[in-house]
A protein has these predicted regions:
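Conserved cytochrome P450 catalytic core segment spanning the I/J/K helices
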Residues: 128-135, 157, 208, 230-301, ...
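Transmembrane helix-loop-helix
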Residues: 135-156
């Protein structure tokens, strides 16, 4: 081997070692060795939550690794996660996201830090004022349940696919809070919203990996590849729908009669004169509520139905408790759950066993 070849090999090895070790210092949590460019991703399976669990057994509940271009710290137990999320330092979100936000949301950092705390505080108070968790909201939810039951009765006990009707029903509960109305399942607007929510979740899942390779994402976007264009079209369709709703609410806004979340937010814009409270941010907030409050509930209900079918003994005990506490002469109320420990335990165990979001959103 000549000296030039030896020098090149030595330099190459040094560069590789430097690349592997960069980003990790004495204050960083322990973690596995990362490869250049791709980090630890090549060693991960299709179930990253299980991969993280295995790494936690080696490096402890808090460890670090590189995911593509990003250095990440993983919290893999309840106590460290709770401690971290209690700190304002973990409120922020990474700048890369599969979902497009309005430039006003990005510029004012409305979804990060202190501005986000204000958005969250206002939203929680607004939902309380609208009756969230109170008898008024219960009555609206009961109306939706009755419509869902009537729809299912039409199947005449024949095998049926429930995903679409559950999606419409759970989304309607969000629509009542946000828009002030619900939509029948065959309403074209209902079908449009269902399409946007369903496709947005599906397309986002396909392009999420690009978050870890922002340089590659820019190249793919430049050549209109990678699926982001489809997601962008879906997001634009949903945003157009929401923008029309906001415009309609502005025309009929009455300070003495706050009908829904959009009404409340529009009035808050007038009061605050805060750039983080504006109509583009409102549109993004609406998208967040539909995205987080529709698919998650729908998926939980699907698992619940499947589990009840798979475990008829459990289903029978749940039905017995329902009959004893509620009977079949009326619809349930929220306070009934205080007398239904078995049913509540079944739901809680299902959410633990079939976790629908095993890895939390990046922070």
């Amino acid at each position: 081997m000549d000296s030039l070849t030896l020098i090149l090999i030595t330099v190459f090895v040094i560069l590789i070692l430097y690349w592997i070790l960069q980003g990790r210092n004495s204050k960083s949590p322990p973690g596995p060795v990362n490869l250049p460019i791709v980090g630890y991703i090549p060693f991960m399976t299709s179930k990253p939550y299980l991969d993280f669990d295995k790494l936690a057994k080696v490096y402890g509940p808090v460890f670090s690794l590189k995911l593509g271009s990003h250095y990440a710290v993983i919290f893999n137990d309840f106590y460290s996660t709770k401690e971290a999320f209690a700190q304002d330092a973990f409120i922020g979100r990474p700048p890369e996201s599969p979902f497009e936000l309005n430039k006003e949301t990005i510029e004012t950092e409305a979804f990060n830090g202190l501005p986000w705390i204000e958005q969250r505080r206002f939203s929680l108070q607004m939902f309380r004022d609208l009756g969230f968790g109170r008898p008024r909201m219960e009555e609206l939810i009961k109306e939706e349940i009755m419509d869902l039951l009537e729809h299912l009765e039409k199947t005449e006990e024949k095998p049926t696919e429930v995903r679409s009707v559950l999606a419409s029903s759970t989304s309607n509960n969000i629509a009542i809070l946000i828009f002030g109305y619900r939509l029948s399942y065959d309403d074209p607007r209902r079908k449009l919203l269902d399409y946007c929510i369903r496709e947005s979740a599906r397309q986002a899942g396909q392009v999420t990996w690009q978050i870890f390779f922002p340089w590659l994402a820019k190249i793919l976007n430049f050549f209109n590849l990678g699926g982001t264009s489809t997601l962008s079209k879906v997001n634009k369709t949903f945003r157009n729908y929401v923008d029309k709703e906001i415009q309609q609410h502005e025309k009929t806004l009455n300070e003495a009669d706050i009908r829904d979340y959009i009404d409340g937010y529009l009035l808050e814009i007038r009061k605050r004169h805060d750039p983080a409270f504006c109509k583009p941010v409102l549109a993004d907030m609406v998208g967040t509520f539909f995205g987080a409050g529709s698919e998650t509930v729908r998926l939980t209900l699907e698992w619940l139905l499947l589990t009840m079918a798979a475990y008829p003994d459990v289903q029978k005990q749940v039905q017995t408790e329902i009959d004893e506490v509620i009977s079949r002469e009326r619809l349930p109320t929220w306070k009934d759950h205080l007398q239904m420990p078995y049913t509540e335990a079944v739901i809680m165990e299902l959410m633990r066993w079939k976790t629908i979001i095993p890895i939390n959103i990046l922070r």
